[in-house]
Amino acid sequence: MKKRNIICFISILLNIFFIFSGIFTIYKNHRVQILQKDNINKNFIKNAYYLAKQSQFETLNINSGDIVFLGDSLTNRSQWQELFNNSHIKNRGIDGDTTSGILNRLNTITRGHPKKIFLMIGINDLLHKQDTAYILSNYEKILNKIRTDSPDTIVYTESILPNNNIKSNRDVKFLNNELQKLSSSKIIYIDLFDRFVKYDKLPGEYTYDGTHLNGLGYSIWKHEINKYVN
């Protein structure tokens, strides 16, 4: 009888231990995820390239007749001014930028009250495993800030482009559908995804690395938005 009681007691202790161990593991993993997200959101603060580009943009003027291309590396790596032969175009793309990074530097753009802003941002958020709700929240903050600080500016939200990862493109397509819902009279959504996607991927003819566009890719992008730029 004593032996059975001892076994029951040990069994209860082990169950209690495993329960608390499981709770601690769940809490620890959740805490790590929160810290990782927080670090991702603030990566631009420690990114020397981002800070250098931002400091340069702070010294450059944007005027009321300008057209601003705002985004990450996909925006940054094109020669928009030459593509459109338009000296009023200003490239404000930064490689690796996210919705948080755009929010952080938006003042350098809205203070000049540009005529138009072409915005493409979000792929790096998705690559960093940010959830759609967070990205959309930042998008709304970006659009609201533009509307408040520069009410006459027309914003063109360009859909995120596909890449060569089919699973990633499912997330991209879902986010694009949500972005389209944010459109209004002064926020115009431009669907570029469907123009670039083929068999659920970005075709090799438009890219060398599966993500960034080559010359042909940028020519197609230009063709798709030409009527909005001019």
Predicted regions and their residues:
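N-terminal secretory targeting modules
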Residues: 1-66
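Conserved SGNH/GDSL esterase-like catalytic core that processes O-acyl groups on lipids
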Residues: 37-140, 164-173
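Active-site flanking residues adjacent to catalytic metal/cofactor-binding acidic residues
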Residues: 70-72, 158, 190
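Conserved beta-strand segments of alpha/beta enzyme cores
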Residues: 88-90, 154, 186-188
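Active-site segments of SGNH/GDSL-like serine hydrolases
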Residues: 123-126, 144-174, 196-199
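Alpha-helical scaffolding segments of alpha/beta enzyme cores, especially the outer helices
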Residues: 137, 141-145, 174-181
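Catalytic His-Asp segment of secreted/periplasmic serine-dependent ester chemistry enzymes
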Residues: 164-230
